[in-house]
Amino acid sequence: MNIHMKRKTIKNINTFENRMLMLDGMPAVRVKTELLESEQGSPNVHNYPDMEAVPLLLNNVKGEPPEDSLSVDHFQTQTEPVDLSINKARTSPTAVSSSPVSMTASASSPSSTSTSSSSSSRLASSPTVITSVSSASSSSTVLTPGPLVASASGVGGQQFLHIIHPVPPSSPMNLQSNKLSHVHRIPVVVQSVPVVYTAVRSPGNVNNTIVVPLLEDGRGHGKAQMDPRGLSPRQSKSDSDDDDLPNVTLDSVNETGSTALSIARAVQEVHPSPVSRVRGNRMNNQKFPCSISPFSIESTRRQRRSESPDSRKRRIHRCDFEGCNKVYTKSSHLKAHRRTHTGEKPYKCTWEGCTWKFARSDELTRHYRKHTGVKPFKCADCDRSFSRSDHLALHRRRHMLV
């Protein structure tokens, strides 16, 4: 009878050990043995003296520690393979982190939630975007502002996450850095690529393409000013009307302008611009002056201001007659002065019966007021008026002396 009871006790112990091995990962607890219903009625089972050794045998069985205690180490990252599919329903949220270099996503398993949370807190300082995607629903929900995460697709057994960045409607010059400006900054090396513009005139003509290279940096290049008319009307006015500019003669202006135009044309012949090249092929190789050349009107003005003292002497117009050393700043004044030496009087009075002639036009105007009686110069202190400005100046001096 005692041998039979010992066998049953050993059998129960083996059964509990098998249960402990099946429950892998569960903590070891002290379990009180329960007898079968057929053995509960026998009084010899409770009186067996060796039954107290059963808890001692269970204490000798060492169970594996739980995984929660193993994941306490916050300095270890997850190295196990992770299933990236988002179609499966999970109870725990999946953390997806996308880096700008490799675009790989890592998710935490339900057993190591604390490890993934600690690793995500350490990686928060790096320039990455961490978005939480709830995989229990069919559509992915992005909790933080960032790129949209589409459904995963597998190629060759590998899972990939499609990260879609919202692209604002902008010009082609807005590069990839403009798209990701609200998410994170990525250092992008941009190379200048020439832009090709195609102009189609008519079905009979061949497409003319103009290649305009993009400037990498505006420091080393001059400002390109598009002016289809060539010279501005202000410059042409200064070239034609020399009396409005003091200390500038018509000869010096024409000489400076012709020099600038000749230099610009020489530069265009050596390095023709794409626009002039297309125009030359279209209009029988006739090259038009274009203001894209580095010699613009502003450069000629700067060159004119910073001239040498020798060029300033050219602006002083001297009378070349013997014994006359008069100097004028305008060429018209010098021409009028030279008429006094030559005796030429081209300006004649047109009043009937008057035969007066004058060397200057202003003298003729003053003389003509004698015939008409016009006195445009009026005194502000009294009611008198005069036909000449110098007479009014003498009259006002008298008022000041009184």
Curated annotation (Swiss-Prot):
Q: What is its main location?
A: nucleus
Q: Which UniProt keywords apply?
A: DNA-binding, Metal-binding, Methylation, Nucleus, Phosphoprotein, Repeat, Repressor, Transcription, Transcription regulation, Zinc, Zinc-finger
**Biased segments, Low complexity type:** 91-125
Q: What are the Polar residues biased-composition ranges? A: 282-298
* Positions where Phosphoserine occurs in the chain: S202
Presence of the UniProt keyword Transcription regulation in the record? yes
GO biological process entries: negative regulation of transcription by RNA polymerase II; positive regulation of transcription by RNA polymerase II; regulation of transcription by RNA polymerase II
Q: Where is this region: Disordered?
A: 79-125, 217-254, 268-314
| Placement of sequence motif 9aaTAD | 80-88
Q: Which GO terms describe its molecular function?
A: DNA binding; DNA-binding transcription factor activity; DNA-binding transcription factor activity, RNA polymerase II-specific; DNA-binding transcription repressor activity, RNA polymerase II-specific; RNA polymerase II cis-regulatory region sequence-specific DNA binding; sequence-specific double-stranded DNA binding; zinc ion binding
Q: Give the C2H2-type zinc finger regions.
A: 317-341, 347-371, 377-399
Instruction: Cite the record's Basic and acidic residues compositional bias ranges.
Output: 217-226, 299-311
- Short name of one Pfam family: zf-C2H2
Identify residues that carry N6-methylated lysine: K313
Q: Which InterPro entries match?
A: Znf_C2H2_sf, Znf_C2H2_type
Residue ranges spanning the membrane: these are none
* Origin superkingdom: Eukaryota
Ribonucleoprotein as a keyword?
no
**Subcellular localization(s) per the UniProt record:** Nucleus
Gene3D superfamilies reported for this sequence:
Classic Zinc Finger (3.30.160.60)
Q: Which GO CC terms are listed, alphabetically?
A: chromatin; cytosol; nucleoplasm
PANTHER family in the record? KRUEPPEL-LIKE FACTOR 12, KRUEPPEL-LIKE TRANSCRIPTION FACTOR
Domain notes from UniProt:
The 9aaTAD motif is a transactivation domain present in a large number of yeast and animal transcription factors. In KLF12, the motif is inactive.
Job of this protein:
Confers strong transcriptional repression to the AP-2-alpha gene. Binds to a regulatory element (A32) in the AP-2-alpha gene promoter.
Q: Indicate the family of this protein.
A: Belongs to the Sp1 C2H2-type zinc-finger protein family.
What name does UniProt use for this protein? Krueppel-like factor 12
Gene of this entry: KLF12
